[in-house]
Swiss-Prot record:
A lipid is attached at residue 2 (N-myristoyl glycine). The lineage of its organism: Eukaryota, Viridiplantae, Streptophyta, Embryophyta, Tracheophyta. Residues 55-321 form the Protein kinase domain. This is Serine/threonine-protein kinase BSK5. One of its GO terms (biological process) is response to cold. It is a lipid-anchor. The gene is BSK5. Expressed in roots, shoots, leaves, stems, flowers and siliques.
Length: 489
């Protein structure tokens, strides 16, 4: 199991720690705009997650996890994270409600706050703020363009300590399975602690899903989590931040005991931190990883130790992280146009306004052969049908619009994807989703790479209750829209 850290003698440990830090209560501001804790219906959450689509899964092990986390979007456009527990996790409804409501009372800018729950039949779900910019694991272990900067790593450690201190001050000192997947980044690039780890049920699997090499010693002995166990896990996270790797504590402590702690440091950080700074963080990690729980620091002293180490405090997190401020995360984007967004929300009024505004621009190159045709009375009559249909469409006389557009289509002289799109919406307005789906598919046949055809298919599929298929079709429309946008550039 490795050496007992309590036997490790490091003469440069401080005898006491200064308490110069922001109190947890100072961080309660900035959360007034959060909604109150709410009960959601299962249907609401199913719709928000596109029928709990596999494409909406954001949790670590995907669909194989016992409890899966999905990203979702509510009718008011709020993004949420939805944790759906397996059916055996919370057999006691009362216990689930009590736990959820207790965690739901917490409000802090260092947390991804719990904003709601659902408890219907055997279903148990939690709803939290959605954090768009991935996990600490992603940014630390699987980065794409740049490794995490030293000053940002120090900030992550401090913000996490502040989150734990706040929770402890509110009577929620236990956090289950604290690891790099539990640290999430918000729209400003600030790290936050997931609220999901604050709830635990005796039947909800193990408190630690990670390798036993990273598990607090007392948990291995007793199977119980105590506040000091959370500090131990915090120590393993400090090792992650120091090394950029997931190093077993026993190996790290061997290096520290041999005064080779610089070998722990991430090679990407060479030249970007002082030895004193590295030493201070290693000291703190060592104290957190003491074998005896009583010898570990409390969360308040973690904040005291980390606050003086902060660097570049005037630089916003999104700059340190290389995230363009105000940029939409890929996880937040379901459509690239207002039409796609309106179809995803099944806002028929907005769809009508957009189709009316766009007119027949998208028919260019598809239905513009008329100038090369011989003008006949039949063609003129066909054009008159379309013109009458357009007038009815503009005036929201959808029954007349269907009749006129149908005459135009059945004449067969000309083909217009926009006419199919307009008649599709008329059918949706008339509560005829099956006919609407047929027209949207015909529009796709005429113009195979027209995003509008896919978006309208999605709107029809939503009307038919086929949410999963609708989300897939929205995704196809989004891909075509992105391709179209890239070709322009």
């Amino acid at each position: 199991m490795g050496p007992r850290c309590s036997k490790l003698s490091l003469c440069w440990w401080p005898t006491h720690l200064k308490s110069t830090h922001n109190e947890a209560s100072d961080l309660d501001n900035g959360t007034d705009d959060l909604p109150s804790f709410t009960e959601f219906s299962f249907d609401q959450l199913r719709a928000a997650t596109c029928g709990f689509s596999t494409d909406s899964i954001v949790s670590e092990h995907g669909v194989k996890a016992p409890n899966v986390v999905y990203k979702g979007r509510l009718e008011d456009d709020r993004w949420i994270a939805v944790k759906r527990f397996n059916r055996s996790a919370w057999p006691d409804t009362r216990q689930f409600l009590e736990e959820a409501k207790a965690v739901g009372q917490l409000r802090n800018e260092r947390l991804a706050n719990l904003i709601g729950f659902c408890c219907e039949g055997d279903e148990r779900l939690l709803v939290a703020e959605f954090m768009p910019f991935e996990t600490l694991s992603k940014h630390l272990f699987h980065w794409d363009s740049q490794p995490m900067k030293w000053s940002m790593r120090l900030r992550v450690a401090l913000y996490l300590a502040q989150a734990l201190e706040y929770c402890s001050s509110k009577g929620r000192a236990l956090y289950h399975d604290l690891n790099a997947y539990r640290i999430l980044f918000d729209q400003d690039g600030n790290p936050r602690l997931s609220c999901f780890g604050l709830m635990k049920n005796s039947r909800d699997g193990k408190s630690y899903s990670t390798n036993l090499a990273f598990t607090p010693p007392e948990y291995l002995r007793t199977g119980r989590v105590i506040p000091e166990s959370v500090v131990y896990s915090f120590g393993t996270l400090l090792l992650d931040l120091l090394s950029g790797k997931h190093i077993p504590p026993s190996h790290a402590l061997d290096l520290i005991r041999g005064k080779n702690f610089l070998m722990l440091m991430d090679s990407c950080l060479d030249g970007h931190f002082s030895n004193d700074d590295g030493t201070d963080l290693v000291r703190l990690a060592s104290r957190c990883l003491q074998y005896e729980a009583r010898e570990r620091p409390n969360v308040k002293s973690l904040v005291s130790s980390l606050a003086p180490l902060q660097k570049e405090t005037d630089i916003p997190s999104h700059v340190l992280m290389g995230i363009p401020h105000g940029a939409a995360s890929p996880k937040e984007t379901t459509s690239l146009t207002p039409l796609g967004d309106a179809c995803s929300r099944h806002d028929l009024t907005a769809i009508h306004e957009i189709l009316e505004k766009v007119g027949y621009k998208d028919d260019e190159g598809v239905a513009n052969e008329l100038s090369f045709q011989v003008w006949t009375d039949q063609i003129q009559e066909t054009l008159n049908s379309k013109k009458q249909g357009d007038a009815a469409f503009k005036g929201k006389d959808f029954v007349t619009a269907v009749e006129c557009y149908t005459q135009f289509i059945e004449d067969g002289t000309m083909v217009s994807p926009t006419v199919f799109a307009r008649r599709c919406l008329c059918y949706l307005m008339s509560n005829m989703p099956q006919e609407a789906l047929g027209d949207a598919m015909q529009a796709q046949v005429v113009s195979p790479e027209w995003p509008t055809a896919f978006y309208l298919q999605a709107a029809a599929l939503f009307s038919l209750g086929m949410d999963k298929d609708a989300c897939e079709t929205l995704k196809d429309g989004t891909s075509l829209e992105a391709k179209k946008h890239n070709n322009r550039n």
